[in-house]
Amino acid sequence: MSKKIDQETIVNHFKNYGFVYQNSEIYNGLANAWDFGPLGSLIKNNLKNLWLKHFIYSKKEMHLIDTNIILNPLVWKASGHIDNFSDPLIDCKECKSRFRADKLILENTKEEINEQTDSDTLIKIISDNKIKCPNCKKSNWTEIRKFNLMFDTSIGVVDDKKDLVYLRPETAQGIFINFKNIQRTQRQKLPFGVGQIGKAFRNEITPGNFIFRTREFEQMEIEYFCDKKDSPKVFDNFLESIKTFLFKTLKIHENNIKIIDYPKEELAHYSSRTVDFLYNFPHGYSELWGLADRGEFDLTAHQNLSKKSLEYLNEETKEKFVPSVIEPSVGVERLLYAILIDAYDEEKIDEENNRVVLKLIPELAPYKFAVLPLSNKLNDKAEEIFNNLILSNICTYDSSGSIGKRYRRQDAIGTPYCITVDFDTLEDECVTIRDRDSMKQIRIKIKDIDLSKVQELFKNAK
């Protein structure tokens, strides 16, 4: 991203090109809910695959799991979500607007608060600082009430025998409760990790900022189990691995990221160390990726309530202990939003022409190639090339409009390479390939069209 862009520009661009659609649009939509269109679905899957390759598939001690969205409600009792997973809400008596009390304080004062700060302290800070309603500018507040963020539902077919259950607010707990199963069936010794990609649900009071904060979202989480004495080293290793993934693999600009290592007084109750990666979104710097040392908190909590041992036996020392856990956690949509913002650019080509270009790495791009016949008379040859390419690469076919307009369309959706089929192609079996970022062109044999080979050719041509 060459300059700061506003959210409206980003949203309009990705809606217009089929990355996202407003959820339930024909029924006037559902607030802050989005469906991923054809291009958004492709790039989302590409992102998940890159995460899996970097964090899971490339390491022998890493395992993948896919747990249920609905778990026994005792899971959420043990984890503390039923009692503590809530936002402090406060209402303006004048205009009836509702806000998170902690957000009001953070946005209007320099007071230091955290998730352990009680309601009495929060209301005193609001009163002492005479914080006004952002909507009507009055200062007439209700008491603070706690609002649990979990969606509840019921299972069972008979009304008076239905059981209360919850849609999971995070994927982590499904990993914790399967710790023993994974360790036993995979014959795994410490240290080892378990990753999961899956849906989570939070009844957010203030969702918004496009796909940054929604009530339904996907998480990519890892719980890495280790001996407590090894946890600092494991933590630092994940810290470097996340940096490598963001800056080397995804090519996100480092100047758009802040890395915050929180002091102990600002840590969550379960964490002994937390580092957040903040991205410079259109609405400001906000959390992109979290890395936490959760210690023995989760396994101990589940062991205590379930009365089942979640201890690990060191076969060499015969010592039994509850493992420590290091957790890197990122939201798929949030990371995707950062990638799209970072890749979006508006360029001036000459005095009369501009272009919007999405400078995605080829591994993320929805399509790697676009096949563009110069004339309808070349469709048969172009379709032959397309059909061969589709077997090994995701590609698209575009025969509508001038070649210049087709180039611009592919630039705007992030296609790295356009393959132009011209009349000479019928004679020499060669095509012209255009590079998205440099707009340079090279001519190669059809049989030589391969993503890695094309990348190398343009690299050497620069």
Swiss-Prot record:
Catalytic activity, reaction form: tRNA(Gly) + glycine + ATP = glycyl-tRNA(Gly) + AMP + diphosphate
This protein's record includes keyword Nucleotide-binding: yes
Binding site for ATP: 202-204, 212-217, 287-288, 331-334
EC code(s) of this entry: 6.1.1.14
Entry's localization field: Cytoplasm
Molecular functions per Gene Ontology: ATP binding; glycine-tRNA ligase activity; protein dimerization activity
GO cellular component terms, A-Z: cytoplasm
CDD domains found in the cross-reference section: GlyRS-like_core, GlyRS_anticodon
Residues noted as binding substrate in the record, renumbered to the chain: 100, 170, 217-221, 327-331
A Pfam short name: HGTP_anticodon
Record-level GO BP terms: glycyl-tRNA aminoacylation
Gene3D superfamilies linked to this entry: Anticodon-binding domain, Bira Bifunctional Protein, Domain 2
Disulfide bond annotation, renumbered to this chain: none
Keywords: Aminoacyl-tRNA synthetase, ATP-binding, Cytoplasm, Ligase, Nucleotide-binding, Protein biosynthesis
Function: Catalyzes the attachment of glycine to tRNA(Gly).
Family listed: Belongs to the class-II aminoacyl-tRNA synthetase family.
Subunit (UniProt): Homodimer.
Name of this protein: Glycine--tRNA ligase
Organism: Malacoplasma penetrans (strain HF-2)
Originating gene: glyQS
